[in-house]
Curated annotation (Swiss-Prot):
GO terms for molecular function: sodium channel regulator activity; toxin activity. One of its GO terms (cellular component) is extracellular region. One of its GO terms (biological process) is regulation of signal transduction. Signal peptide: none annotated. It comes from Bunodosoma caissarum. Binds specifically to voltage-gated sodium channels (Nav) (site 3), thereby delaying their inactivation. This toxin has moderate activity on Nav1.1/SCN1A (EC(50)=about 300 nM) and Nav1.5/SCN5A (EC(50)=307.00 nM). It less potent on Nav1.4/SCN4A (EC(50)=820.84 nM), Nav1.6/SCN8A (EC(50)=about 900 nM), Nav1.2/SCN2A (EC(50)=1449.17 nM) and Nav1.3/SCN3A (EC(50)=1458.42 nM) (when measured as the increase in the slow component). The lineage of its organism: Eukaryota, Metazoa, Cnidaria, Anthozoa, Hexacorallia. This is Delta-actitoxin-Bcs1a. Disulfide bonds join C4-C45, C6-C35, C28-C46.
Length: 48
């Protein structure tokens, strides 16, 4: 999957560890949660 920035990763994507996985459709898989809040973002940033 493609890494994405969770809210807990920090304010920018430069120099931070991206701990989320990008899911484009259907929300996060079972057992995962959306770790990204509101904002201009396509899909869901999911984390185990």
């Amino acid at each position: 999957g493609v890494a994405c920035r969770c809210d807990s990763d920090g304010p920018t994507s430069r120099g931070n560890t991206l701990t989320g996985t990008l899911w484009l459709t259907g929300g996060c898989p079972s057992g995962w949660h959306n770790c990204r809040g509101s904002g201009p973002f396509i899909g869901y940033c999911c984390k185990k």
